Regions:
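Signature of uroporphyrinogen-III synthase
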Residues: 1-195
Length: 195
């Protein structure tokens, strides 16, 4: 049986689950996170929007200079970490596209979107459609770190569009079953490849 290749650095609990299930796997990280110094903009913001665990880490290391900031967060674990650190999370969803109802109800407010240099496009597209007032701040860069696989995978699991992009730079083609975590990742697959 060819191993499952996971294009993501696995957490301990994810590794444990695969081992308990008896699934042979390789975990590969095709990306590197490079934190940036955040240049906090002046002005008033009603909500701070957090869409990735990397931004959560940035906020835990560098507190924003805005008192009484209300957070809108993508991800249950991210919301829990921020609440534990003393932040006020007023709304949380599993992915950015699911925040649509909240943004429609609060379309007159001003938002600060802290994000990486990739991703977040579903939120930005919605805001532009709703004519929402926002500022965007880049907290980290996501570098692609392509390298060839030394083993023929039995299947691939992708956690991000960047991992798919990086994999294709080196491998050129995907000829095994593919599993994607989330619809945004699945949408990044080339035409003709089903997840």
């Amino acid at each position: 049986m060819n191993p499952l290749t996971v294009a993501h650095a696995l957490k301990k609990e994810e590794e444990d689950l695969l081992q308990q299930a008896g699934v042979p796997y390789h975990a590969l990280s095709f990306t590197e996170i490079v934190p940036l110094t955040i240049d906090w903009p002046g002005g008033h913001f009603d909500y701070l929007v957090i869409s990735s665990p990397q931004v959560v880490q940035c906020l835990l290391e560098e507190k924003p200079p805005y008192p009484h900031l209300l957070l809108v967060v993508v991800g249950e674990k991210s919301a829990a970490r921020l609440k534990k650190a003393g932040y006020t999370v007023v709304h949380q969803a599993a992915r950015g596209a699911l925040l649509s109802d909240f943004f429609q109800r609060h379309c007159k407010e001003c938002y600060l979107f802290i994000k990486g240099d990739r991703g977040g496009s579903d939120i930005l597209t919605l805001w532009q459609h709703l004519k929402i007032n926002y500022r965007e701040v880049i907290a980290y860069r996501l570098l692609l770190t392509p390298y060839p696989l030394n083993v023929q995978p039995g299947a691939l699991v992708f956690f991000s569009p960047a991992a798919i992009e990086c994999f294709l730079q080196v491998q050129g083609i995907i000829n095994v079953p593919v599993y994607c975590i989330g619809p945004t990742t699945a949408a990044a697959l080339p035409q003709g490849i089903l997840a």
